[in-house]
Amino acid sequence: MSGVNEIRSTFLDYFKKNGHEIVPSSPLVPRNDPTLMFTNAGMVQFKNVFTGLESRPYSTAASAQKCVRAGGKHNDLDNVGYTARHHTFFEMLGNFSFGDYFKEEAITHAWNLITKEFGIDRNRLLVTVYHTDDEAFNLWKKIAGFSDDRIIRIPTSDNFWAMGDTGPCGPCSEIFYDHGDHIWGGPPGSPEEDGDRFIEIWNLVFMQYEQLTKEERIDLPRPSIDTGMGLERISALLQGKHDNYDTDLFRALIAASVEATGVPAEGEHRASHRVIADHLRSSAFLIADGVLPSSEGRGYVLRRIMRRAMRHAELLGSRDPLIYRLLPALIQQMGRAYPELVRAEALISETLKLEETRFRKTLERGLSLLSDATSTLHKGDMLDGETAFKLYDTYGFPLDLTQDALRAREIGVDISGFTDAMQRQKAEARSHWAGSGDKATETVWFELKEKFGATEFLGYDTESAEGVIQAIVRDGKEVDSAAEGETVHIVVNQTPFYGESGGQMGDTGVIVGDAGTFDVSGTQKKGEGLFVHSGTVSKGGLKVNEAVQLTVDHDRRSRLRANHSATHLLHEALREVLGTHVAQKGSLVAPERLRFDVSHPKPMSAEELKVVEDMANEIVLQNSPVVTRLMSVDDAIAEGAMALFGEKYGDEVRVVSMGTGLHGAKANRPYSVELCGGTHVAATGQIGLIRILGESAVGSGVRRLEAVTGQGALAYLAEQDERVKALASSLKVQPGDVLSRVEGLLDERKKLERELADARKKLAMGGGSSDAGANDVQQVAGVNFLAKSLSGIDAKDLKGLADEAKANLGSGVVLLIAVSDDGKASAVAAVTEDLTGRFSAVDIVRTASAALGGKGGGGRPDMAQAGGPDGTKAKEAIEAVAAALAA
């Protein structure tokens, strides 16, 4: 059998020719599932299909699903790199049946694929079944011809599969491969089952139940099949390897790491190359799916993975950012199967490089602290939790990175102490995320969707329409009517109201019936296509099955349209000015303004913002038509339409195009082309004007633009004009002369500040004459000793004053202490050249620092500086130094 890519294709081709729909991998960030941090199994994207909440146009499917396990229940991070089969990122091959076929067909497909297509020796195979699953036991005997001793009944949860605390579940049957008696280990269920002789290669889950709570389990509407086969594991077997990292894909990544570092993947360095290869995969795919490193949630898990890889790069002697340089090797291996890697290459590379550059600034200092803290520890000892927390809080070391750094020395970490330290400092728990737990309140919308189907949206063509009330929901339950003053949610068969999504706020307006009026305060999309109108009955009452007139607030909708279209123009302008790595990370389209988050590693300059604004407004002034078309996702992408990573699109998508490019590669071509379900202006001129208010950081690698359009932009400019006029009046100049007048005032202020600082320094040292400070000079052990405590002097000026004092003394020792407004002290000691053989400025300043409540200090024998928290001890510090000189 050939390489990993061919093995993946063989699996998918087998099920395609057996009538299965080949479904692309879903993103690593689960859609509409708050219970999961990352997609960790092939069935995740089909969860609502299994539970009956969603229907698909096919009843059988197969996929190669990208998965990440690095947090929560499924956490493989600690073992990655040190074992043969642990990964943070892996591909799960699976076939699925949604009420179509069940156990017999699933077992038949599995047996035919592994013995015929893959050509695995059937005599090396054995299986497990759940201990009460007689049906599966007998089917294996019938289909595979197994004897009873090769079908092992397992009574534990190992053979009862569940995705999590809630969700689909059922008994399973696992297929094992026997590597032979030359490898230690026993069959599943035996005391030696943890050995490496018998390796699971495929898990067949017979999906029969849904776990609602810990105590409640119900039958699924239709018995179904969910199977999972790790691509890395089956590839190792088919390539004659016992270790996943010896397969062709990992060998290529490790070879790239070896070439970049010049360190062979042998001995103590073997694990480091493996960690880097694995973590490169998970990091790149997470970034491609829209996750960026941050201090919480998914972003913090990504940061942990990246920093663990960077720590191992440091172990290999790499002193410059390394991981991003390995990205081309990954894309060469996996880019054809996963084109999102190619599309996001610039963003992935820039994010990896930036994060590694930032972390390296603290990595060496953190490792130095760790080395000092463990210098007296031995094998079996524990690092205290306080130090582990300091590494986490000050140096950005995730706890597992500290554990990994101590692993080779077999030193543990006091986890309890770490947790206590975190709680004492009220630090946020960053590595776990439990989701919102709002399933119960959402169930009603899925039930209504199942009952009535999706709401027909009319809002692209009209702002007013007739409809029939299908449901009224109050406090999570259906009711027959709503009376005046009641706050409820209303579902209508068709609506012109846009439901909040894609960053655009939902419409407001009124719903009017024969005997009542409902003020719509917001509209949301629920349950995969249900439009829910929220608000209050302001007059009379409304009831289910009543015919009503729905009218959208026209002025508000117009402003929303303008702001939404502006985000498209800004998005394209940002990509032209900053680079194609720019991708939308979020947005808020409100009536008053717009907010637009994009991936970019550094602040934008004022010049860049002006160019972006000007380019977007060029398209506004074109007043070109905004064109919308319906087409397949593949056709849209082929035409160059931008899609948002992680966004869920149906078989048919809406493509919005606006403007004609005027510059570079975009010249005479459609300017902005995006997949978008929002509402837009009919022509770009209706936007009126785009004015960027500013940009800021919202997280690592994410910048936020805020802007206004149309009337909002005019109001903003009018307000700014009034401010300039008021400022001009205060300065007694014309508005056009305000800038030059302010610059003159600032120059004058700087001059006065310099003169004041010089005067303070002269006054502090006694007036500035050649004998300045003579009254402060005392004779100690026959040496001139000038010591002063100064107020109103910046610490940064102390060295200059000390140099002047040395020059005036000719021969002697100088100690100057500046006390700041907050009571802290800074000290500088200076020794003239003729005395450096007797006295060291470093020793002198450390003596002063100790008296000031500090410790340490450093510099040269002739000039050194230190500090201390207690400036009230300045006199004691001078006395301590005098005593030290006399000793």
Curated annotation (Swiss-Prot):
The prosthetic group or cofactor this protein requires is:
Zn(2+)
Q: Mind listing the UniProt keywords for this protein, alphabetically?
A: Aminoacyl-tRNA synthetase, ATP-binding, Cytoplasm, Ligase, Metal-binding, Nucleotide-binding, Protein biosynthesis, RNA-binding, tRNA-binding, Zinc
Tell me its EC number(s), please: 6.1.1.7
| Pfam family membership, one | tRNA-synt_2c
Top-level EC class: ligase
**What's an example GO cellular component term for this entry?**
cytosol
Tell me the Gene3D superfamilies matching this sequence: 2.40.30.130, 3.10.310.40, 3.30.54.20, 6.10.250.550, Bira Bifunctional Protein, Domain 2, Threonyl-trna Synthetase, Chain A, domain 2
Q: How is the cofactor bound?
A: Binds 1 zinc ion per subunit.
- PROSITE patterns the record matches: AA_TRNA_LIGASE_II_ALA
Family per record = Belongs to the class-II aminoacyl-tRNA synthetase family.
The identity of this protein, by name, is Alanine--tRNA ligase
